[in-house]
Amino acid sequence: MDKLIKTISESGSFRAYALDSTETVRTAQEKHNTLSSSTVALGRTLIANQILAANQKGDSKITVKVIGNGSFGHIISVADTKGHVKGYIQNPGVDIKKTATGEVLVGPFMGHGQFVSIIDYGTGNPYTSSTPLISGEIGEDFAYYLTESEQTPSAVGLNVLLDKEDKVKVAGGFMLQVLPGASEEEIARYEKRIQEMPAISTLLESDDHIEALLNAIYGDEPFKRLSEEELSFECDCSRERFENALLTLGKDELQAMKDEDHGAEIVCQFCQTKYEFSEADLEELIND
């Protein structure tokens, strides 16, 4: 089971989240049949949203849109505060690696665009904020968003590693944030550690990468574990929801669908679940 660990430095001046999102991203890859670059890009977006959602309270829903003008198209993710996330990438078929190293490429295929966050508190007035993509690598773009839009200096590392068959091997990451009251001396110490820490891909290869991440972030500094939360890829789509969507088309459109197409098939963008509606089903909706 994937998990996210929340921690705070003993001084109360820094907080860090470390997470294992391997099963989340593996499920996304299986559902969307993504190739290497698309898998990594979608996975990084899901991890970023898991971190954002962990910062929210109540029954908020958080939508992250990474909107680029490159080959990927848009990447959309929706998360709740209970550890569930879902998402999709417009082009699941991008598969480009560096010839010399085999490194999966992401940034060049994201292109220029925006990192957008929409937080729905359930009050009917969602809060939207966005920042430009600075690299298209998603992790750096997310850190820039947190620092610029949420006004919280942040360090972020997130990645998805694939095996020789391009299946998800491990996925996860961390977020470190400076809290009010941190001294310049403390900030300098943490900055030095972050600059000197091993690459996120190296830390993810560790036997227990959550512990490896926390050790790299805190070093010898004492810290407290605040909570451990379960994470998963989970879609909340349902037949009833799509029935309601069909009803919004109006009776004439439903009648045409029944007469010309002899039914309807709707595929959920987020999880690829197919919902079949027969002529009899459509007739029932028309008479509803």
Swiss-Prot record:
HAMAP family noted in UniProt: HslO (MF_00117)
UniProt family annotation:
Belongs to the HSP33 family.
GO MF entries: protein folding chaperone; unfolded protein binding
User: SUPFAM superfamilies, from UniProt?
Assistant: Hsp33 domain (SSF64397), HSP33 redox switch-like (SSF118352)
What does this chain do?
A: Redox regulated molecular chaperone. Protects both thermally unfolding and oxidatively damaged proteins from irreversible aggregation. Plays an important role in the bacterial defense system toward oxidative stress.
An example Gene Ontology cellular component term from the record? cytoplasm
| Name of the protein | 33 kDa chaperonin
InterPro entries of this UniProt entry?
Heat_shock_Hsp33 (IPR000397), Heat_shock_Hsp33_C (IPR016154), Heat_shock_Hsp33_N (IPR016153)
Q: List the disulfide bonds.
A: C235-C237, C268-C271
Name the keywords, alphabetized: Chaperone, Cytoplasm, Disulfide bond, Redox-active center, Zinc
- Gene name in the database record: hslO
Location comes to: Cytoplasm
Q: Which domain of life is it from?
A: Bacteria
Biological process annotations from GO: protein refolding
Name a Pfam family for this protein.
Answer: HSP33
- UniProt modification remark: Under oxidizing conditions two disulfide bonds are formed involving the reactive cysteines. Under reducing conditions zinc is bound to the reactive cysteines and the protein is inactive.
